[in-house]
Amino acid sequence: MDLNNFMFFINLFHRFYFLFFPVYNGLESGYSHFHADYYEYYEFYIYYLFFAGFTFFTFLSKGVIHMKLICSKSNLLNGVNIVSKAVPSKTTMSILECILIDATKGQITLTANDMELGIETVIEGEIIEKGIIALDAKIFQEMVRKLPDNDVTIETDASYKTIITCEKATFNIIGKSGEDFSYLPQIERSDSILISQFTLKEVIRQTIFSIADNFTNKILTGELFEINDNVLKVVSSDGLRISLRKIELKNSYSDKKVIVPGKTLNEISKILSGDADEDVNIFFTDKHILFEFDNTTVVSRLIEGEYLKIDNILSADYETKVKVNKREFLSCIDRSTLLVKEGDKKPIILDIQDDIMELKMNSIVGSLDEEIDIAKNGKDLMIGFDPKFLIDALKVIDDEEIEIKLLNPKAPCFIKDEQESYIYLILPVTFSTVA
């Protein structure tokens, strides 16, 4: 409450007192001494007092600023963009469509929560009046995005009316009570690992593409995070391919195994800075996983169940080993997809003979036949694959030269490095011989 409002209220009370004081004195002295002038206006005084009092308390409630804060547009927009990734696209609970602004604890905290994934981040700014408000995420995000690049002032009152001001632009919107918002669950910060933001971002990038994109098998919509002998193993699969990354951890950690939703990892990868000098703390419980980095906290429910047992699959024998330049191989496969119409699943055929691998594609659009040099050990082989699956794996491999291991036309191929820090398993597809 500012000084002008305070003085207005004092003056109003002052007037009420001197208006009612004569009536009160007259009543104290008994009706026999009650002055006729006072009695004539007594009923009017009572109604007036009731109306003025009601108006006063209504004004007191709605006119007082319940929250006021100032922060730069860039800080605010960055925070809103981070937490908005946890706002559900569809929900029956309107409060979950909001971003919570909490300025009650000496810092400005933004939170969004869809009950499966919750994100909280702290932004820099000045708190003039402490308070809390929930604002529609889509509207608020667009408002902030389109404001001038200057300081933004956010004010609210008891009726949740929110005024957002920046330079000469002023938005008025109605928010919701922050008391109804679902806060992030309290997670015990005891069982954890520490890795760099760069490493986590890379691990997600190199595995996320092969998770299942439907809920026929919910477990496959997530990724396995397994720690064993201080090695973090991350696995994803959609049933037709498997992606695996191994990371040696610097410190000693207890063994653990959890399934993290792909949506959670996808959103985290967009937030991480990718800085090798900045770390991420990852905390594990039976039901949740928590990622803590910079000024941001991400909490996600885990997927319950048993993940695929892949150890026996990945240790399969091979009869043909090929070493090939990754960039040349990828470019050739990419060219072949020009002949495939959307929705038409045509395989690319690898005809491996001596030191040459011939790539063939045949469709109603046309055909492709291209040779690339390889180093081969073992038998000649002809095998077909979905070109998209090969492209997805090759795009995330940073090595200049890759190694492909194959057994027969019906067995999966393995793309891996010598240390097996990454392994990509891809099932072959049937094909007819290209003329």
PLM features: residue spans?
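Structural preference for solvent-exposed beta-strand-turn elements
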Residues: 20, 24, 38-435
